[in-house]
């Protein structure tokens, strides 16, 4: 017995972890409109923002198409951004080819795009909602997959950059790095914060240099920056959380920072309370922290959610310092 399309959509969403948007009340695109939609999606496989376009009238007929278009634009933007990083053109081209192939597989889906015989209008509308929902799920799965691939590429790039620096660390490189950290610390940290994987990689590279005074200076500089950050804008608040969490990642089992951490513990706790003030929301805080950290350790979560939030707020009288 053939499994009905709504059941397939539901099972696909549950198994993959991709959740379709709430079912819209209507989706009145016609069978002829499907050809236009298919052609637009096929054109989007080029992974160029200029090629991701869908007629506003079609989106008005079926709101799910807005989500689908947004997902395709997100992927195109993600791939375009790779060109401005240190990732090789070959890797970017390979990713684009993979994306194009998978989009072309989606547009070949008979369940979604094959013309169906006419029938009751309400049944046809319900069937079209199911077809567009499946399309949304498939595009969302592809978006998630591309996101995971680009994330791995960034990880590999950051690791390679600092591995090469460590392997080829001459006196001139060490001296130049120390000079930049001494003279341009704020500017350098601000630039590194555009990619937190690279931010953490740069901090770990300092351990390779083994310059204790420089490591102390950078640690203090980051604390000062966190202290000065405003919580009034979402961008600044989000950036501060990423910086705090990955600063703690750098601290994990770091022989250069054992003493520094002891001395700055109360300051760290106060800053943790600044960015995570909802002390009773431990589970949500923990999930948020794990989503930001680029290390496998539990240390950032333990510090922020337990010591800095629970004990500091209740027993160490830090509330009044904020």
Curated annotation (Swiss-Prot):
Location in or out of the cell: Secreted
Disulfide pairings: 27-62, 249-295
Residues the record marks as carrying a glycan: 168, 175
GO CC field: extracellular region
Species of the source: Aedes albopictus (Asian tiger mosquito)
Top-level taxon in the UniProt lineage: Eukaryota
Assembly mode: Monomer in solution. Interacts (via the N-terminal domain) with cuticular protein Cp19 (via the C-terminus).
Keyword field: Allergen, Disulfide bond, Glycoprotein, Secreted, Signal
PTM notes: Proteolytically cleaved by human mast cell tryptase and chymase. Glycosylated.
Tissue specificity of this protein: Female salivary gland (at protein level). Female saliva (at protein level).
Signal peptide: 1-20
The protein's role, per its UniProt record: Salivary protein that promotes mosquito blood feeding on the vertebrate host by inducing morphological changes in the mosquito labrum. Interacts with the mosquito labrum end tip and triggers salivation and probing. Modulates enzymatic activities of human tryptase and chymase.
Keyword Disulfide bond carried by entry: yes
Additional facts recorded: Antibodies against the protein are found in the serum of individuals exposed to Aedes albopictus bites.
KO phenotype (gene knockout): RNAi-mediated knockdown results in prolonged intradermal probing prior blood engorgement when mosquitoes are fed on human host. No significant effects on probing and feeding time when mosquitoes are fed on membrane-covered heparinized blood.
Protein name per its UniProtKB record: Labrum-interacting protein from saliva LIPS-2
């Amino acid at each position: 017995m053939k499994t009905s399309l709504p059941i397939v959509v539901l099972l696909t969403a549950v198994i993959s972890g991709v959740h379709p948007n709430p079912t819209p009340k209507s989706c009145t695109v016609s069978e002829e409109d499907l050809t236009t939609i298919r052609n637009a999606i096929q054109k989007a496989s080029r992974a160029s923002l200029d090629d991701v376009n869908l007629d506003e009238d079609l989106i008005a007929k079926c709101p799910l198409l807005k989500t689908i278009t947004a997902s395709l634009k997100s992927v195109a933007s993600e791939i375009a951004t790779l060109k401005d990083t240190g990732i090789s053109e070959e890797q970017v081209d390979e990713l684009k080819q993979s994306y194009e192939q998978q989009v072309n597989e989606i547009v070949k889906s008979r369940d979604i795009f094959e013309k169906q015989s006419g029938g009751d209008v309400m049944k046809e509308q319900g069937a079209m909602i199911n077809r567009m929902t499946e399309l949304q799920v498939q595009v969302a799965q592809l978006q998630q997959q591309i996101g995971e691939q680009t994330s791995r590429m960034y990880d590999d790039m950051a690791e390679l950059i600092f591995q090469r620096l460590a392997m080829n660390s001459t006196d001139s490189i060490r001296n130049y790095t120390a000079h930049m950290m001494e003279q341009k610390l704020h500017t350098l940290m601000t630039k590194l914060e555009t990619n937190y994987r690279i931010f953490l990689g740069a901090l770990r590279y300092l351990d390779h240099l083994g310059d204790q005074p420089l490591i102390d200076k950078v640690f203090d500089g980051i604390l000062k920056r966190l202290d000065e950050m405003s919580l009034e804008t979402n961008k600044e608040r989000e950036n501060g959380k990423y910086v705090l969490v990955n600063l703690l990642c750098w601290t994990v089992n770091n022989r250069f920072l054992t003493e520094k951490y002891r001395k700055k513990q109360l300051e760290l706790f106060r800053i943790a309370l600044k960015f995570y003030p909802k002390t009773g929301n431990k589970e949500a805080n923990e999930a948020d922290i794990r989503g930001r950290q680029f290390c496998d350790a539990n240390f950032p979560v333990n510090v922020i959610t337990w010591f800095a939030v629970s004990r500091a707020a209740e027993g160490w009288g830090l509330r009044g310092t904020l």
